[in-house]
Curated annotation (Swiss-Prot):
It is found in: Cytoplasm; Nucleus. This is Acyl-protein thioesterase 1. Hydrolyzes fatty acids from S-acylated cysteine residues in proteins with a strong preference for palmitoylated G-alpha proteins over other acyl substrates. Mediates the deacylation of G-alpha proteins such as GPA1 in vivo, but has weak or no activity toward palmitoylated Ras proteins. Has weak lysophospholipase activity in vitro; however such activity may not exist in vivo. Keywords: Cytoplasm, Fatty acid metabolism, Hydrolase, Lipid metabolism, Nucleus, Serine esterase. The active site is at residues 125, 179, 212. GO terms for molecular function: carboxylic ester hydrolase activity; palmitoyl-(protein) hydrolase activity. It catalyses: S-hexadecanoyl-L-cysteinyl-[protein] + H2O = L-cysteinyl-[protein] + hexadecanoate + H(+).
Length: 232
């Protein structure tokens, strides 16, 4: 059940909440690793009415990661080889995490009366991959996607299993050109794949010299994107 999914939940300070952001962390991180974002959003004054946003930062389960010699760490799915888009992928684990994100979306709809089109999903690295896949698999429309340093582990099967509910949904993809973990070209190929599949509002943002992280410029661009989505 969705209420059992471990997450850092930051409730809107202005009631009732009118929108929600669900942001999924990357490998080895936790929900608390991104729980500073609501404060940044408020201080930046970029996102209007940010006090009426529910924030959810889910925690990944612990699992052995093959590419790290089997070391157990928080992960949304196993990684067999870093930086290689052609490497073997943990398809079952990946889909399980997509189901987790779907449950969190439905939690906001069912328990907090947030309209689906006012829910933005997103994430960093593994979390971005899960968010990008989930928006393609959902059978109802959400507000938008923020994918930072993202990729698609299911690029071969996605055309056969995707739904079309979110073809008009705006998607923000940001990627640093110096990323050694998720190669920049892997991110760019994912953006091109989504455009080829019929997603009409995919915007790929390039950040020169940025490694596997989110720069201040990227975060500001993401917040401007969120503001545009939520004010519609």
């Amino acid at each position: 059940m969705s209420q059992l999914i471990p997450a850092v939940r930051v409730a809107a300070t202005a009631k009732p909440a009118k929108s929600a952001i669900i942001f999924v962390h990357g490998l080895g991180d936790s929900g608390s690793g991104w729980s500073w974002f609501p404060q940044l959003a408020k201080q930046s004054n970029i996102i209007k009415n940010c006090d009426s946003i529910n924030y959810v930062f889910p925690n990944a389960p612990l699992m052995p990661i093959t590419a790290n010699g089997g070391y157990v760490m928080p992960g949304w799915f196993d990684i067999y080889e870093f930086g290689n888009p052609e490497a073997k992928q943990d398809i079952d684990g990946f889909h399980k995490s997509c189901e987790t994100l779907k449950s969190l979306i439905k939690e906001q709809i069912d328990n907090h009366d947030i309209p689906a089109d006012k829910i933005i999903i997103g994430g960093f690295s593994q979390g971005a991959a899960v968010s990008l896949a989930t928006v393609a698999l959902l059978d109802f429309k959400v507000g938008g996607v923020v994918a930072l340093s993202g990729f698609s582990p299911i690029k071969e099967s996605l055309p056969q299993i995707m739904n079309k509910a979110n073809l008009e949904t705006p998607i923000f993809q940001g990627h640093g050109t110096a990323d050694p973990i998720v190669n920049f070209d892997f991110g760019k190929q994912t953006s091109e794949l989504y455009q080829k599949l019929g997603f009409k509002n995919v915007k790929f943002h390039t950040y020169p010299g940025v490694a596997h992280s989110a720069s201040e410029e990227e975060l500001a661009d993401a917040m401007n994107f969120i503001d545009d989505v939520l004010k519609k």
